[in-house]
Swiss-Prot record:
InterPro entries: GAF-like_dom_sf (IPR029016), HrcA (IPR002571), HrcA_C (IPR021153), WH-like_DNA-bd_sf (IPR036388), WH_DNA-bd_sf (IPR036390), WHTH_transcript_rep_HrcA_IDD (IPR023120). Pfam families: HrcA. Negative regulator of class I heat shock genes (grpE-dnaK-dnaJ and groELS operons). Prevents heat-shock induction of these operons. Gene3D superfamilies: 3.30.450.40, Heat-inducible transcription repressor hrca homolog, domain 3, Winged helix-like DNA-binding domain superfamily/Winged helix DNA-binding domain. This is Heat-inducible transcription repressor HrcA. The gene is hrcA. One of its GO terms (biological process) is negative regulation of DNA-templated transcription.
Amino acid sequence: MLTERQLLILQTIIDDFIGSAQPVGSRTLAKKDEITYSSATIRNEMADLEELGFIEKTHSSSGRVPSEKGYRFYVDHLLAPQNLPNDEIVQIKDLFAERIFEAEKIAQQSAQILSELTNYTAIVLGPKLSTNKLKNVQIVPLDRQTAVAIIVTDTGHVQSKTITVPESVDLSDLEKMVNILNEKLSGVPMSELHNKIFKEIVTVLRGYVHNYDSAIKMLDGTFQVPLSEKIYFGGKANMLSQPEFHDIHKVRSLLTMIDNEAEFYDILRHKQVGIQVKIGRENSATAMEDCSLISATYSIGEEQLGTIAILGPTRMQYSRVISLLQLFTRQFTDGLKK
């Protein structure tokens, strides 16, 4: 159990190192307003903290830096919520204020904004479309031969694609088809749509649509949409701006992992509900052993729909990042309920 004095010194060391990226010595601590102890007392307490494994020496300086154990204790016991500036709150809320909530577009923009606000790498795993349910479908004619099919799901995902309208299918047929599809398919999981259309809907359409065969062929192409979740990155190269990653050899494997993207599917897919912080070697990938990954899930009720994560150095602004992720996931969840 750490004493109050040790807790204060440990917190001050970590806060200073997060801000400066420079090892912290007793002289630096003695100049802090919140530290009222003598240099000798500070040195003794730092020696004890080092012996306990919370801080460690560096090869190039007489100062100390936090260890993984130190960061873990800091996150679990010393972290205080950070109030975000009003302009950042407004910027984030504006992103989610559009009347039509397009989850895919929002996920992409969220990754970009988060990377700009943190100067770290932001990763957003969008909702898995196969678990979405159809809300409605629209077919909007552009001219006599082409139209745009718009598929909207219950989570706000909007999928649009240009389709060719056969000459034998007129506007009244299109209107009848859309009405039947919305009446019969609203609430059906996206993964079941194709089977439902060709097992049940075709029979209904046969009685209402004149050029039935051409209409069915057009429908087949309309509902062929990718069902797996998409992953979006913002600030892929931001790690290079961090002092600890100026050595390209040190960061090469991490940049390769970020660029390939696939490994992050598995990492983010299986996240537990809520905020999770993985520090250094707590991460399963060896390329991330000098990084921290903070992730947050967004959901509707009990259904977890996706994950937002920030990847940065272990010397990360934990409090700020957690506050940002909490705001984003709250806005994302509210948007999906629209």
